[in-house]
Amino acid sequence: MNILSAGKNYGWPLVSYGINYNGTRVSEHAWREGIEEPKIVWIPSIAVANISFYTADRFPKWKGNLFVGGMRTGEVAGTGHLERIVLNDRGEELRRESLLTMLHQRIRDVRQGPDGLLYVLTEEQAGALLRIEPAN
């Protein structure tokens, strides 16, 4: 994942950390001079479904965090999670936290609602729309 800036070269598909469905690499190069490095990489892929920045006040400690819907955890298909990524003021990753792993659901969508809460859409047969609220 990158934060895009005008005039920068992000390299797709000349460079990539990605793997095709058949197991081959998308590119033989993960990096080349003159091409911007990604800010965040998932190895192995979590099969990113959606990304949302949290800007509301309902979860003060989460303000400015990135929330990523993942459709897999590690190499196990059908075991997604919601990933919270804490960023510094320069958009650099400080740490990650896996949330909702106990659901064993692929996370299809995550969005901040107008009420400042997070809404998560899961997949699978028992798919649901979840509202994430503060504990207190």
Predicted regions and their residues:
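Beta-propeller domain segments
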Residues: 1-97, 105, 127, 134-135
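Blade-level signature of beta-propeller repeat domains, shared across WD40, Kelch, NHL, RCC1
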Residues: 109-136
